[in-house]
Amino acid sequence: MKYSKRYIAFTFILALIFVSNFYIYAKDSSTLGAFRGAQIDNTIWSPLVAADVNGTTIRLRIENKEYTSEDEHVYMDENRNIMVPVSMLRDALNSSAHVYNKNELLVEKHSLTADFKLADNNGFVQYKGQFYASLDKLSKLLDMTCSFDTATNTLTMTDKSEGVSTVPTKYDLRERQRVSLIRDQGSYGTCWAFAATSALESALMPEEQLLFSVDHMSMSNSFNVNQYDGGEYTMGMAYLAAWQGPVYDADDPYGDGVTRDDLAAVKHVQQMLIIDGKDYQGIKEAVFKYGGVQTSLYSTIASSKTKTPYYNKQTNSYCYMGQDKPNHDVVIIGWDDNYPKENFNVDLEGDGAFICQNSWGSSFGDNGVFYVSYYDTNVGTHNVVYTDIESADNYDNIYQSDLCGWVGKMGYDKEDMYGANIFTAQSAESLRASGFYATAADTSYK
């Protein structure tokens, strides 16, 4: 009996030693330990390491932003790559990240690109209906450092290109299949609704290619205006924030003078980003990361057939430098910092232009697209981009009172404010989210 106890104790000690050694080796994600001259097979060892890492919280520190596997579905695969949802890459890496044809991932940062085909050992996989990418493989292609701290289960990723612009000097969403169909507003004052729906469609591309109803946005909103009255970007924001739309164009086609109030929104817009006036870098980053940016111009052109001294028809280039306020909305779909100033009808200090999508049909400009100089008085003054668009079943209900959204602002020169709204629940429900407008950058809330 005494020997049995000794054997049991000895076995227990060996087990502790083995577990301790296993833990140490499992945390080593860069080498394989040899055991008495024998090399352990990587196909056996790596899954054990991954299982150990996935058994605890994985932490990510990416360019001063922090994430955990408790907040995002982050995991280590059987090849010891830290895998993150592709939906994280855009904001985590401050990059453009999109899936094409459900089998190809294109990530862009600075002037660098990382292109992956869907494959188990290629750094781009599909798991439980969601796409994932390897941070280690991305870092090697995007000039970033990537290290894994085994003691804290923390991956750290930093950009080696310090001081380099996030975006390239030239970018065109048409070349990335992220521009919606060119349409014609006709004689109606609906440019604001065309710009809003086009920007929304662009934000969903290339993963989804949808066509939303301009008729519904311009007629089934809460502003009690007709299609000849015109509008502005805040009206589109209010319509979308209230989940009054969007609806499909096929269900409420344009130009027939009637709309359908019985249609439900097919998408829920959960976040919109208002970009500060003349923040050209912010506009470029928004186009790069999210898609088309709705903006405003002053235009003396009423259609593709109208002539104006501010538009060079030969080069499809526009620049207005006066005091008149905006009266027309378009969508910024790209830029060219070196676009020649000589292409415009006015004398300019320097080169550079935004590439804009219009709503005057394909006969205007270059198949509906034209250039607007950086020196234009109004371009980039009022801007909005749609940054979070979810399926229409994300929530069961919405309670709201401000159906016209942001129509003005007032304040008391204070940094903090409190607000409240009271609604009567229709049944026993759980509050999952709340929405509001923040009219200043870097606003925090709780």
Language model: regions and residue ranges:
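A generic local structural motif
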Residues: Y3-S4, S69, Y280-Q281
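Sec-dependent N-terminal signal peptides of Gram-positive bacterial secreted proteins and lipoproteins
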Residues: Y3-Y25
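Compositionally biased regions
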Residues: K5, N21-F22, S30-T31, S96, ...
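Positively charged, low-complexity intrinsically disordered regions
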Residues: Y7, G37, I62, N81, ...
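Generic structural marker for isolated residues within well-ordered, non-membrane alpha-helices
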Residues: I13, V86, L135, L200, ...
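Solvent-exposed amphipathic alpha-helical surface segments
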Residues: V19, S96, T145, A203-E207
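Primary recognition of N-terminal secretory signal peptides and signal-anchoring hydrophobic helices
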Residues: Y25-T169
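Catalytic-core signature of thiol
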Residues: D159-R432, Y437-K446
